């Protein structure tokens, strides 16, 4: 399959053009499982950025990866009905659920819906990519409360460490440049995520690979207070 034809198909998936996607799949069923032979790199990224969903296409991504990134349950269901694999990994080891957990834009209901759908058909909420990152780590880092809740409801481990030994709670208490972390909205999301993780069994005494407890990773007195109280205030 020509790369240009595959990229055009991905554009249709991202745009949510179900009729065109259906026609392409009927003509070329392999599109449902084809892994992208190209993708964003440090040298060339612009051509693989989809502004509609604020997400890059990476080598190894399937159409389902991009439907998940678009938070499109209808498109994900269409692709699955044509044989797409909800456990497909790209070259970085990321699965569609990893992309669904990213909070690149504010569509909480749609994001939660696609996460719930993927888990319902067999996506593994604790799957890790090549860097040891699970979907919950992504959702926490991007301050996506709806995604965090959907993942926890679907069986994500609130104490799962990444390769650095950081648990979701370690990540939740740190400042992140994503999603406008300095805004009032982001701070509220952060507080609610911390409270939710604590409710679901996360422990402030857990240590990362360097022996640092969550308390020590907290970047402000406000966050340390939340940890002590065990709730958002």
Predicted stretch roles:
Residues 1-15, 19-23:
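N-terminal capping/linker segments that flank leucine-rich repeat
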Residues 25-31, 77-85, 116-124, 149-157, ...:
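Ankyrin repeat domain, specifically the short helix-to-loop turn at the C-terminus of the second helix
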Residues 3-9, 34-63, 89-103, 128-134, ...:
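Ankyrin-repeat boundary/"N-cap" motif
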Residues 20, 74-75, 113-114, 146-147, ...:
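Conserved ankyrin/ankyrin-like repeat signature
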Residues 198-199, 203-232:
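Leucine-rich solenoid repeat scaffolds
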Residues 11-16, 54, 66-72, 99-111, ...:
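Ankyrin repeat A-helix N-terminal signature
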Residues 112-113, 124-164:
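Eukaryotic tandem repeat interaction scaffolds
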Residues 146-149, 153, 158-210:
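Ankyrin-repeat and related helical/solenoid repeat scaffolds used for protein-protein interactions
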